[in-house]
Amino acid sequence: MTSPYATLAYNPIRDNDKLPVLVRLASPSDASLVYSTWLRSYADQNKDQHRGILYKSHRKIIRNLMEKSVTVMAVMDDDPNQIFAWMCGLRVESGPLLVHYCYVKDAFRRLGLANLLLKYFEHRQGEPIICSHKGYVYKSLRDRYNLFYVPQVREPLGVDKFRDGKWKL
């Protein structure tokens, strides 16, 4: 936005070429944010499903996946309560990286935050990523990030089957 009268006030997030970001493990106090953003964004991307039923049934799926996985938060480095993005996933020993869901706030999209969160899981370029959920951006990222959509991972024992080596790519 340009103004003939004055320049916009300096905004360190917008005006820096690098976000002041810290990656930390999610804490119990982050759970409500993760649940609400996961459910809302997933429901928004699946408008053909009844919203009430999706919320009720998917809450159990999210709880199971979060209990068996790791959730990491991308936060402002000097204020760990200012959350930019989060990712729930699991690095399977001698197996693929499982990513259940990644959420980036609108204002911070296309700034490399999802890549930063993938680095927490020691993702290597070209390595396959198993996705238990698929959203709008899946198709555009599928080839570049070697994504494989496997919704069966959402089953109660789905994560365990990858962890135990019963399911492989």
What is each stretch, according to the model?
Residues 2-19, 123-169:
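Terminal substrate-recognition subdomain of acyl/acetyltransferases
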Residues 20-36:
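A short beta-loop-alpha structural element at the N-terminal edge
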Residues 73, 81-91, 98, 103:
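Conserved beta-strand in the GNAT
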Residues 104-124:
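Conserved acetyl-CoA-binding loop-helix of GNAT-fold acetyltransferases
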Residues 16-17, 78-82, 95:
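Short, solvent-exposed loop/turn segments that connect beta-strands within catalytic domains
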Residues 48-78:
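Active-site rim helix/loop that mediates acceptor-substrate recognition in acyltransferases
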